[in-house]
């Protein structure tokens, strides 16, 4: 019965039967197939026991064959399962050849003839060939290389579709937003400026310093900005820049206690003034107290420190007074020069102002502090020690007014020029400048105590006169003489600075950093610090020589 039903079909008419690579299962006595239809051999007891019922599903036996188009029966002696009309090779992609990179695309959902793929001679369900997930090719904006590049401007502005999609797919009218591509490597085509633009939060390279470490600046964070465009609060350092604040912000900060005070120049001048006041007081206190000790047996009528008033010439007394003045200045300058500069002398203050080492405001503050410090030291020495207060300065030794003025002027010029070369000019031995300054005052006192009292300091002579209430007729020489001496020292300092004295004996300190012949930056600093510009000397040979 089964042979009569299927005698016109052949197993070789199916694609699987025609495929030589198909390997049928070794066991031919399988009880079932994928479709649930049993395979029964011809002339077997199972085949004889099956009743002939046309309505039943046909039973395929191995002896039966499917009719081929040529009418020849199959001679296969193994069971061949039926396959769908669409080949397995047509529904999976094949790799490309070795000579080309073209890959066969995946099979479409429909067969070549447009008909739905059906399973022949099977009663089971067939899974749809429709893809259940979207692949990378199903999305539009995923890589810049998928679009027509801007270099091919005709295709780009024609809005031509991608070549790996069907002809109905078009690129969208807008490019992807830049934040989607900011962290992606730039593409290899000419669209890199379009899809990978610079980060607007970072200034361009031509507007910022590329290597701040070379200039000694600290590194800034990635997104550096101030708290606002008006205030001056630096996030990196956390310091308040008072000069960069607006008037409204300053008024708001004024409400906080001591905020404006701690960020103003007034506070700095106040601290310098207090330091100068205390330093002058301590310097003159020890100097006046030592002078009191030296003049214990002196004449108490004149109350001066000159050699003539202290009785007969006593070298030991002159040496004692000179030593106490020199050492007192050395110690107190060494202590207070970090606070106020350790000037302790109105003549030195005027000289520093003339060479622009200090400002006018600072000079006025220091001058007042020095005068007050001299008066306080005089009060303390007068009422602290039981001896007579003999520390005023007057002319002695037969010196006239003119002689007294020039003695004070020359001695003050020596002291001021020593301060210029040891303290103002920065060098390797700047930190021991107080030693040289104290020794300069010591040798000046060795000469001046006998004839003028060795003042060299208007504040030193003014304080005792105020406390004793007696101003001598020659008191003015202790103001004019030191002022002239300061002017002499300033003029000579300008002269050697204009001629670049550093080049006359380079390397005298043994410091290559301050040697202009070995350090170009020091050479430029010397040329920039000339007190008189070269243009003031005119032009021509003179200007070239001085420059």
UniProtKB/Swiss-Prot annotation:
Positions annotated as glycosylated: 302, 314
UniProt short sequence motif NPA 1, positions renumbered to this chain: 345-347
Role of this protein: Probable water channel that may have redundant functions with FgAQP3.
Organism superkingdom: Eukaryota
Motif (NPA 2): 457-459
TM stretches of this protein: 270-290, 317-337, 364-384, 401-421, 429-449, 476-496
Subcellular location: Membrane
Record-linked InterPro entries: Aquaporin-like, Aquaporin_transptr, MIP
Biased composition (Polar residues): 1-13
Comp. bias regions, Basic and acidic residues: 152-169, 198-208
Effect of inactivating the gene: Leads to no variable phenotypes.
Keywords annotated in UniProt: Glycoprotein, Membrane, Repeat, Transmembrane, Transmembrane helix
Cytoplasmic side: 1-269, 338-363, 422-428, 497-547
Extracellular side, ranges: 291-316, 385-400, 450-475
Name used for this protein in its record: Probable aquaporin-5
Ligase as UniProt keyword: no
Catalytic activity: H2O(in) = H2O(out)
Chain's gene name: FgAQP5
Any one of the GO CC terms: plasma membrane
